[in-house]
Amino acid sequence: MAVEHNMQSSTIVDVLEKILDKGVVIAGDITVGIADVELLTIKIRLIVASVDKAKEIGMDWWENDPYLSSKGANNKALEEENKMLHERLKTLEEKIETKR
């Protein structure tokens, strides 16, 4: 009589799919010091997830980054317009003050 073993094997694709679906957070601190004097501290925070999972947890910085998205370039135009409007408002306020 043969004994059957139920062995599960995962391929790299299966592992990556699970990681991207659920997300993985890696955090660590590296400190270099001599004689109780801290010389260097490196704080590492890494998240590995799919784009959908990242958006789900509120990480969508790449959507508004002008170097990564066309939406981000629009923010630059809005900033310029806002600056121009502030300058116009300041000029108008100064004109009102001088007429008083």
UniProtKB/Swiss-Prot annotation:
It is found in: Gas vesicle. Pfam families: Gas_vesicle. It comes from the Bacteria. Its main location: other. Keywords: Gas vesicle. One of its GO terms (cellular component) is vesicle membrane. Signal peptide: none annotated. Belongs to the gas vesicle GvpA family. A minor component of the gas vesicle, might be involved in nucleating gas vesicle formation. This protein could be important for the shape determination of the gas vesicle. Gas vesicles (GV) are hollow, gas filled proteinaceous nanostructures. During planktonic growth they allow positioning of the organism at a favorable depth for light or nutrient acquisition. When a minimal gvp locus (gvpA2-gvpR-gvpN-gvpF-gvpG-gvpL-gvpS-gvpK-gvpJ-gvpT-gvpU, called pNL29) is expressed in E.coli gas vesicles are made. PANTHER family: GAS VESICLE PROTEIN A1, GAS VESICLE STRUCTURAL PROTEIN 2-RELATED. Interacts with GvpA. This is Gas vesicle protein J. The lineage of its organism: Bacteria, Bacillati, Bacillota, Bacilli, Bacillales.
